Amino acid sequence: MAIILPDLPYAYDALEPHIDAETMTLHHDKHHATYVANANAALEKHPEIGEDLEALLADVSQIPEDIRQAVINNGGGHLNHALFWELMSPEETQISQELSEDINATFGSFEDFKAAFTAAATGRFGSGWAWLVVNAEGKLEVLSTANQDTPIMEGKKPILGLDVWEHAYYLNYRNVRPNYIKAFFEIINWNKVNELYQAAKA
């Protein structure tokens, strides 16, 4: 059973004007599809390790060395993007009271969290991701990862993530990454974030 490219949970133009349809089409149909194809090609070389990417990336030492980086790059790329699509919504959603209180306790206020997340996304040199995670101690934490590395590799559970590779925003925002980050906060699917938060804390 090969890894499958998931459908977008909304139309390509559903997130406009924040993310344009052309960007969504290229991002999903080309970039994400390539990660899926390359992850499958790598895993086919070692069928004995299976296809559970979350389990494999939680302990990359178990991935045979000849495909390890390919699985990190492409398996991570698939997991990150499959989550990313679900973390956005054209519908207005609300953060849960429990998560809101945890954010306030951890960062001081929602605005302080937003500033920390924005700093992580803006400060990531080159390509990568910004994340809100639940760490091994059950605490919220903001961090960024390079390339397609996933917080799962650090034993952390991502509940919100933003792709800051240029392919995610360049058509619409050119080199002004902060405007893209600001737009992202307008389309966050808090229903999904709340769900991931509850699962991570369980």
From Swiss-Prot:
Binds 1 Mn(2+) or Fe(3+) ion per subunit. Changing E98D: In strain: ATCC 13813. Its cofactor is Mn(2+); Fe(3+). It catalyses: 2 superoxide + 2 H(+) = H2O2 + O2. GO terms for cellular component: cytoplasm. Belongs to the iron/manganese superoxide dismutase family. This is Superoxide dismutase [Mn/Fe]. Fe(3+) binds at H27, H81, D163, H167. It comes from Streptococcus agalactiae.
